[in-house]
Curated annotation (Swiss-Prot):
GO biological process, one term: translation
InterPro entries registered for this protein in UniProt: Amidase, Amidase_CS, Amidase_dom, AS_sf, GatA
Subunit structure of this chain's protein: Heterotrimer of A, B and C subunits.
Keyword match Ligase: yes
Residues at the catalytic site: K76, S151, S175
Alphabetical UniProt keywords: ATP-binding, Ligase, Nucleotide-binding, Protein biosynthesis
Entry protein name: Glutamyl-tRNA(Gln) amidotransferase subunit A
UniProt KW Hydrolase keyword: no
Enzyme class: ligase
Organismal lineage: Bacteria, Pseudomonadati, Pseudomonadota, Gammaproteobacteria, Legionellales
């Protein structure tokens, strides 16, 4: 049962071959058995999930089902969930019970999905390996000695291990796509503003975007149908009609123009991944796509610009955690200054503190022009590169990561090496574009991911191409050998 996709489970529920309670209990039992090995969940909401599942069965019996009625999903622990702990992977919020639901949570509730638990993540979404969590590292289900990627590593590992059929993630510099690639699942980062950020704990507000993580493009489309849309509570949410993302999944790829940027195939790319992308190219060509070599000349500046801009926004956003209003508070502070210093020193992990320090530095009066302003100019040039490319191509094909999943603790002491694991995903966030990562092969029993980048609000096209590709391949059907 756990090998089935959301689309298949949805049909089973409609056909009454299984109830939502049975389905939810099956996944809860699987989580209890396997999660202690993977550490992909921070909270498991068993009682709440079974209550929701009973209500879903009642709606199904009355013929009142909505798009995801009865389907268990997991929420990344960055989304506020009313009366359920929302930790953001941090000691700072270990005791935080949100008084309201994030819009992402609200939308999936409206669609009828069952919240089965909150997934582990890098603290405040800062990381590429899920080793920065206060609740311990998540392990990659394909190799328990390797990372699942980050920051949405818990969601990626849970979907890959079939502990849940779908989950939410957030993507600030690749945090949906990189773990999706390393765990062999499908992950979509929508256009900036397509999905509401209300109730999503902020890391870098001009870069953060929520999106779906699932086995297939079809499942990602079903989840995005529920997630996407304008929200007046989020000032960055864009008021644009939401199409039915499942309606165009089977559209022909005849005449599709795909760009191959030479900057993404240079030094640092594992040769097996390069070969897998070439195989994706040949598969799409057989379906009618044509390929054009393009240039994205400012690609090499994306990572340096990102690691100025994201920490700058992080230092501002995380200033609110001071031990006064909510979150961790140190014991017996001698005065207000001591309260601030010790609460933040004890409450934040080392990577978060590193980024706050970098951000404070680049925003300081003497360095603002030299770093922050220059990075913003580079950001515009990167966006312009993409806009020029989209004058001649419909989408862009690249690797999702330079290597397969690396060993736990391999890069934790070398921040630059860790940061470069997102080298193929960062530019997309700087430009605010949509992109999807999907399974494209294996190397030494480890998944390889490809990435498609689209123009603004062209999520439907990305899902269509990925779905058609998945009809011709079975990489997405592979699952790790767990109990």
């Amino acid at each position: 049962m756990h090998q089935k996709t959301i689309a298949e489970l949805k049909q089973d529920l409609r056909d009454k071959t299984i109830s939502s309670v049975e389905l939810t209990q099956h996944f809860l039992d699987r989580i209890k058995t396997i999660n202690p090995t993977l550490n992909s969940f921070i909270s498991i909401t068993e009682e709440y999930a079974l209550t929701q599942a009973k209500a879903a069965d009642a709606r199904l019996a009355k013929g009142e089902a909505t798009s995801l009625t009865g389907i268990p999903i997991a929420q990344k622990d960055i989304f506020c969930t009313k009366d359920i702990k929302t930790s953001c992977g941090s000691k700072m919020l270990d005791n935080f019970i949100a008084p309201y639901d994030a819009t992402v949570v609200e939308q999936l509730n409206k669609a009828g999905a069952i919240l089965i638990g909150k997934t582990n993540m890098d603290e405040f979404a800062m990381g590429s390996s899920n080793e920065n969590s206060y609740f311990g590292a998540v392990k990659n289900p394909w190799d328990l000695e390797r990372v699942p990627g980050g920051s949405s590593g818990g969601s990626a590992a849970a979907v890959a291990a079939r502990l849940v059929p779908g989950a939410t993630g957030t993507d600030t510099g690749g945090s949906i796509r990189q773990p999706a690639a390393l765990c062999g699942i499908t992950g979509l980062k929508p256009t900036y503003g397509r999905v509401s950020r209300y109730g999503m704990i902020a890391f870098a507000s001009s870069l953060d975007q929520a999106g779906p993580m699932a086995q297939t493009a079809e499942d990602a489309a079903l989840l995005l149908n529920a997630l996407a849309g304008h929200d007046a509570k989020d000032s960055t949410s864009i008021n644009k009609n939401v199409p039915d993302y499942t309606a165009t999944l089977t559209t022909s790829l005849e005449g599709l123009k795909v760009g191959l940027p030479k900057e993404y195939f240079g030094e640092g790319l594992n040769s097996s991944i390069a070969e897998s992308i070439e195989t994706v190219k040949k598969t799409l060509e057989k379906m009618g796509a044509t390929f054009i070599e393009i240039q994205l000349p400012h690609t090499d500046f994306a990572a340096p610009a990102y690691y100025v801009l994201a920490p700058a926004e992080c230092s501002s956003n995380l200033a609110r955690y001071d031990g006064v209003r909510y979150g961790y508070r140190c014991d017996k502070p001698v005065d207000l200054d001591d309260l601030y210093k010790r609460s933040r020193t004890e409450g934040f992990g080392s990577e978060v503190k590193r980024r706050i320090m970098i951000g404070t530095y680049v925003l300081s009066a003497g360095y603002y022009d030299a770093y922050y302003l220059k990075a913003q100019k580079i950001r515009r040039l990167i966006r312009d590169d993409f806009m020029k490319a989209f004058e001649t191509v419909d989408v862009i094909l690249t690797p999702a990561t330079p290597t397969p999943a690396f060993k736990l603790n391999e890069k934790i002491a070398d921040p630059v090496a860790m940061y470069l694991s997102d080298v193929y995903t960062i530019a997309v966030n700087l430009a605010g574009l949509p992109a999807i990562a999907f399974p494209a092969g294996f190397m030494d029993q480890l998944p390889i991911g490809a990435q498609l980048i689209g123009n603004y609000f062209e999520e439907a096209r990305l899902l269509n191409i990925t779905h058609r590709y998945q009809q011709e391949t079975d990489w997405h059907k592979q699952s790790p050998k767990l109990r």
